[in-house]
């Protein structure tokens, strides 16, 4: 880290009398690793990984800096202002865009690690999500991901004589046939609140219809025929969900307690499904119309800018080490099933193959991994990732638009035009 080092004269004198001491001091370097694993059991896993790394690299010490997710943004800002950012930071691909915009990422160091690991080590489509806005670099080295889609109870669909829905129309048909509001049973648990989850959920349908918030030139493209079709569809689908504003808890609870046999949620529903005792009864499909679109959130390790050369080199070694098969497997398996590997090597390890959760899920983990190439997110167009998408999500315009037409029964065309105008004004300010 960038700190002024005060060395006592007596220490220098005593060191001069010890053979080899001068060389050791010169070569030893300490770096910090900031992450969001505040739970003790996760810190224990990371401690073992660090101990393994330090044994292989006796000249480097790695100190953990666990930070609650809610405090992450504030912590990064505070540390960057004081010139004391940790050399390695765990970050979502969304937050990495913000860091890159503020020039807090050492793009060259990140590229060095990806070169060390090999671009081919990652599943197709993964590195595309961590591309910088100009498409010339990466914002971090991917370590895991979670994806969202449609979960369904196989037995409920089978009992009703319904097959797994493969496209928009089939999904709507299944939801309508299973919808029984008079008995407080609903066709699908669908996010409709003014929340990030609603934006993420709706984005899958929009992107599967080739509707994006930005075009390749960085212009807002909300008020388009493709977006209108997606919004119309989402409203029709929402007619078969629970009344009111549904967010994370409402959607998850409805699926888990049997109120709805289908739900749009992330892979983080799987721990509850496993606890329930019959995970093979749960199927997964993704919104598909003109193409398949999976919402995905990538977690990366990024290397911060402005560090001393030896600290940056140590950080590169540490992140490269973390991508080795057994190490990255230990990282991913802190959340088995919920967190998906993005490095192909994970599934070859005993850590993955022998895990009870992975075994219990049968073919589902492989199916989920196979969806990684289909990850699409608002603001990513080709090889470009527009950093202003963070401002769009922060404004809540998209989720409010969806909420207003589903829960509020607002006119679609008017709402779409008003939302386009709000985002145009927002982008002009930034």
PLM-predicted stretches and their roles:
Residues 109-122, 192, 209-229, 275-277, ...:
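Short, solvent-exposed loop/beta-turn-alpha elements that line the ligand-binding surface or hinge
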Residues 51, 136, 228, 232, ...:
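Extracytoplasmic/periplasmic substrate-recognition and gating elements
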Residues 52-122, 129, 159-166, 261-262, ...:
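Extracytoplasmic "Venus flytrap"/periplasmic binding protein-like
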Residues 133, 359-419:
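C-terminal capping/gating helix-and-loop segments adjacent to ligand/active sites or protein-protein/ligand interfaces
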Residues 27-40, 60-65, 88, 139, ...:
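Short, well-ordered beta-strand elements
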Residues 174-177, 181, 217-245:
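Glycine-centered hinge/linker elements that transmit conformational signals in sensory
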């Amino acid at each position: 880290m960038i700190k002024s080092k005060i060395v006592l004269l007596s220490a220098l004198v005593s060191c001069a009398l010890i053979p080899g001491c001068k060389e050791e001091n010169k070569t030893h370097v300490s770096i910090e690793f900031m992450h969001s694993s505040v739970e003790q059991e996760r810190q224990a896993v990371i401690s073992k990984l660090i101990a393994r790394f330090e044994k292989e690299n006796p000249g480097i010490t790695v100190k953990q800096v666990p930070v609650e997710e809610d405090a992450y943004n504030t912590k990064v800002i505070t540390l960057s202002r004081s010139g004391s950012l940790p050399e390695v930071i765990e970050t979502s691909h969304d937050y990495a865009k913000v860091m890159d915009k503020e020039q807090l990422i050492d793009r060259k160091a990140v590229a060095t690690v990806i070169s060390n690991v090999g671009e081919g080590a990652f599943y197709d489509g993964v590195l595309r999500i961590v591309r910088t806005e100009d498409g010339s670099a990466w914002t971090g080295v991917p370590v895991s991901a979670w994806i969202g889609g449609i979960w369904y109870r196989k037995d409920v669909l089978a009992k009703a004589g319904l097959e797994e829905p493969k496209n928009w129309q089939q999904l709507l048909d299944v939801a309508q046939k299973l919808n029984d509001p008079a008995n407080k049973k609903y066709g699908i648990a669908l996010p409709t609140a003014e929340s990030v989850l609603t934006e993420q959920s709706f984005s899958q349908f929009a992107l599967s219809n080739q509707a994006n918030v930005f075009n390749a030139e960085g212009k807002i493209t909300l008020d388009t025929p493709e977006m209108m079709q997606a919004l119309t569809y989402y409203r029709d689908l929402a007619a078969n969900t629970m009344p009111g504003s549904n967010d994370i808890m409402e959607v998850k609870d409805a699926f888990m307690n049997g109120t709805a046999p289908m739900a749009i949620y992330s892979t983080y529903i799987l721990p509850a499904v496993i606890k329930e005792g019959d995970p093979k009864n749960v199927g997964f499909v993704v919104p598909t119309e003109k193409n398949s679109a999976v919402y995905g959130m990538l977690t990366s390790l990024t290397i911060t800018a402005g560090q001393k050369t030896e600290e940056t080199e140590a950080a590169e070694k540490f992140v490269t080490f973390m991508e080795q098969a057994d190490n990255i497997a230990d990282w991913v398996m802190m959340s088995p099933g919920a967190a998906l590997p993005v490095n192909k090597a994970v599934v070859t390890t005993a850590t993955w193959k022998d895990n009870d959760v992975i075994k219990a899920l049968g073919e589902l983990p492989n199916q989920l991994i196979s969806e990684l190439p289909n990850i699409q997110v608002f603001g990513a167009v080709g090889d470009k990732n527009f950093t202003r998408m963070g401002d769009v999500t922060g404004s809540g315009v998209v989720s409010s638009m969806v909420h207003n037409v589903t829960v509020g029964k607002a006119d679609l065309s008017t709402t779409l035009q008003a939302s386009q105008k709000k985002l145009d004004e927002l982008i002009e300010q930034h």
